[in-house]
């Protein structure tokens, strides 16, 4: 990290203000080459003219110097706050590179902040998630994680396991001594308690991942029951072609939109039927796949027709999926003939009004909100599961008083927990994670 890096910290394009950021041991010296100043006072905003290396004036703006270690990265940082637009910031960035800085890689500022102890990995992931969040509830969850709630949760469990490991390794050196009975029971309780905590947070985070990424909602049913009409009604524009001809939708259509404070991804699928042609059958296979990957299913039936084997097959597929499902009986403006009793079925006329379905969805999504700590990435979920399983294995080894293997399992749990906040094997994990961050962050 000896090089001084530079990047545009604001979005590329037209705007009122652009920020060009430098970080590194030579950030101040490099910046002063573009300023006719002898120094900059740390943490003071200085209005200054900004020049090229060839003394051509580039802009006039605010320059702020953050002296290490009191900065985002823990290194010296200088920020140029200039007039917005593409060319001004590009010219300043190019001159800083001419002056000795290097263009930063995506996420390199955040990576340096992590390596310098300014944030842990959980906070870094939450920060990136917050930047890309598209719903109010996601922003709330990620803000809480940025404040350190997850780091504290993991740290407390890790501390208890480390303390136990230190004691057990001492006991291994004195193998002739028996473990005190009261300590044995306390340790067993600690292992079970923390294993359950980790398993619970991993399960909750998997089940409610839609709070952060958006819930996937699949609209399924036979051809020509009104699935596309419902989609168009939700979006308030004609996204899908609506026709009386069966099989009009042959591929799945996906759109993002918000229901209340929640982001959802709605999937309109091809109608499920047994006598489909080859191309349509591919669409039907996508429909079945959509059921498997969806968080919520909207099963649409034609209320003006008696049920048939295809309706029963759709109900069977949904029942086997164990997913939250809403049963919708469409075409309520026509004589009702559907003869299968469906608990909580919603009767609508999609061509007139589908708002009752949106209200039901909004009500259900609110029940998924939680004040509990959540994991924001698959990596965190996997690490929690690994730590939980290691503690379970340690419990079994402790029962058999196999202290060496018990200590090994505790070490496995500690390593899994550390990977959430401060991984032992840093380089590969960090390179992969920070490469997805914004340039200049």
From Swiss-Prot:
GO cellular component: a single term: cytosol
Task of the protein: Exhibits a very high intrinsic GTPase hydrolysis rate. Involved in the addition of a carboxymethylaminomethyl (cmnm) group at the wobble position (U34) of certain tRNAs, forming tRNA-cmnm(5)s(2)U34.
Residues binding GTP, per UniProt: 224-229, 243-249, 268-271
Signal peptide (from-to): none
Identification of the protein by name: tRNA modification GTPase MnmE
InterPro entries: G_TrmE (IPR031168), GTP-bd (IPR006073), GTP-bd_TrmE_N (IPR018948), GTPase_MnmE (IPR004520), MnmE_dom2 (IPR027368), MnmE_helical (IPR025867), P-loop_NTPase (IPR027417), Small_GTP-bd (IPR005225)
Presence of the UniProt keyword GTP-binding in the record: yes
EC number(s) given by UniProt: 3.6.-.-
Entry keyword tRNA processing: yes
Residues engaged in binding (6S)-5-formyl-5,6,7,8-tetrahydrofolate: 21, 79, 118, 441
Family: Belongs to the TRAFAC class TrmE-Era-EngA-EngB-Septin-like GTPase superfamily. TrmE GTPase family.
Record note on quaternary structure: Homodimer. Heterotetramer of two MnmE and two MnmG subunits.
Pfam families per UniProt: MMR_HSR1, MnmE_helical, TrmE_N
Binding of Mg(2+), residues: 228, 249
GO MF: GTP binding; GTPase activity; metal ion binding
Free-text remark on how the cofactor is bound: Binds 1 potassium ion per subunit.
């Amino acid at each position: 990290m000896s090089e001084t890096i530079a990047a545009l910290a604001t979005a590329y394009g037209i705007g009122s203000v652009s920020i060009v950021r430098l970080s590194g041991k030579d950030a101040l010296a490099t910046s002063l080459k573009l300023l006719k100043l002898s120094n900059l006072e740390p943490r003071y905003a200085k209005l200054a003219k900004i020049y090229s290396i060839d003394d051509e004036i580039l802009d006039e703006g605010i320059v702020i110097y953050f002296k290490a270690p009191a900065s985002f990265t823990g290194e010296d940082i200088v920020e140029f706050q200039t007039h917005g637009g593409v060319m001004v910031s590009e010219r300043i960035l190019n001159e800083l590179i001419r002056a000795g800085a290097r263009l930063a890689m995506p996420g390199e500022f955040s990576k340096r902040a992590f390596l310098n102890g300014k944030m842990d990995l959980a906070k870094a992931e939450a920060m990136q998630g917050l930047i890309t969040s598209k719903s109010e509830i996601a922003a709330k969850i990620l803000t809480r994680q940025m404040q350190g709630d997850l780091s504290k949760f993991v740290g407390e469990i890790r501390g208890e396991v480390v303390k136990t490991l230190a004691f057990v390794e001492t006991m291994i050196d004195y193998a002739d001594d028996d473990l005190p009975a009261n300590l044995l029971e306390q340790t067993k309780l600690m292992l079970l308690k923390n294993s359950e905590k980790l398993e619970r947070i991993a399960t909750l985070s998997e089940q409610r991942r839609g709070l952060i990424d958006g819930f996937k909602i699949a609209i399924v049913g036979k051809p020509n029951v009104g699935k596309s009409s419902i989609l168009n009604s939700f979006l308030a524009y004609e996204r899908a072609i609506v026709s009386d001809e069966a099989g009009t939708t042959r591929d799945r259509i996906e759109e993002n939109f918000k229901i209340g404070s929640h982001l959802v991804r709605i999937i309109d699928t091809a109608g499920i039927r047994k006598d489909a042609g080859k191309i349509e059958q591919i669409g039907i296979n996508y429909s079945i796949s959509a059921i498997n990957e969806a968080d919520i299913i909207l099963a649409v039936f034609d209320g003006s027709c008696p049920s048939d084997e295809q309706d029963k097959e759709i109900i069977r597929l949904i029942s086997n999926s164990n997913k939250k499902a809403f049963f919708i009986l469409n075409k309520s403006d026509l004589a009702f003939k559907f003869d299968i009793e469906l608990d909580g079925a919603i009767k609508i006329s999609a061509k007139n009004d589908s708002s009752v379905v949106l209200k039901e969805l909004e009500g259900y999504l609110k029940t998924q909100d939680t004040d509990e700590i959540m994991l924001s990435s698959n990596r965190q979920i996997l690490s929690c599961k690994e730590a939980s399983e290691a503690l379970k294995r340690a419990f079994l080894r402790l029962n058999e008083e196999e202290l060496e293997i018990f200590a090994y399992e505790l070490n496995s749990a500690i390593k899994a927990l550390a990977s959430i906040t401060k991984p032992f094997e840093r380089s590969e994990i960090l390179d992969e994670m920070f490469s997805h961050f914004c340039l200049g962050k």
